[in-house]
Amino acid sequence: DWTDLTMDVAPYQTSKTKAEQYLWDFMKEHEGKTDMEAVAINPSMVFGNSLSDDIGASNLVVKRLIDGSLPFTLNICINIVHIKDVADMHFEAMINDKAPGKRFIASNNHMFFPEIAKVLNDNGFKAPKRKLPTFLARILGIFDKQISFFLRDIDILRIYDAKNAKDILG
């Protein structure tokens, strides 16, 4: 399924969706004119080591959970994948004859932010122990743009189906 761009979607998701749609339009337009193949790998929230000082947006969320800049969590579910698994998928997609022309979701698990905070606390970090109640988040969202952006995702279980990727790419 495609991200519904008629909804209130973050610029990041919009750019990713449009880029992939352009890829498939390009491939269709050049079908039979080139031997080029395409595969789309759509990772969920990517965590893991960074090769540079830029830790990336996903790792920044964890950093903010443990550095005290987030005093509470919101009950938001995210799907997660390790950077090494994403790299392995890219490699496998290049050498697997069943991959061309397909779209794959890279996701290993899903967790709500309070669960993530608990895992961090259980491993010696000082993540928030409080979850902001939904009613209070909705009130604060009127004044805080960051909280407002996440309101549509509070208390919603989202599980990305990566079965296709696991079946074909391993």
Question: Model-predicted segments: where are they?
Answer:
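A conserved pocket-lining segment of Rossmann-fold NAD(P)-dependent short-chain dehydrogenase/reductase
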Residues: 3-8, 52-53, 59-81
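Active-site Tyr-X1-5-Lys
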Residues: 5-38
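Glycine/proline-rich active-site loop of Rossmann-fold NAD(P)-dependent oxidoreductases
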Residues: 32-35, 48-61, 93-103
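Conserved sequence/active-site signature of Rossmann-fold short-chain dehydrogenase/reductase
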Residues: 46-48, 86
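Substrate-positioning beta->alpha
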Residues: 57, 72-94, 102
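Mid/C-terminal beta-alpha module of Rossmann-like enzyme folds, strongest
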Residues: 89-148, 167
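Active-site loop of classical SDR/Rossmann-like NAD(P)-dependent oxidoreductases
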Residues: 113, 149-162
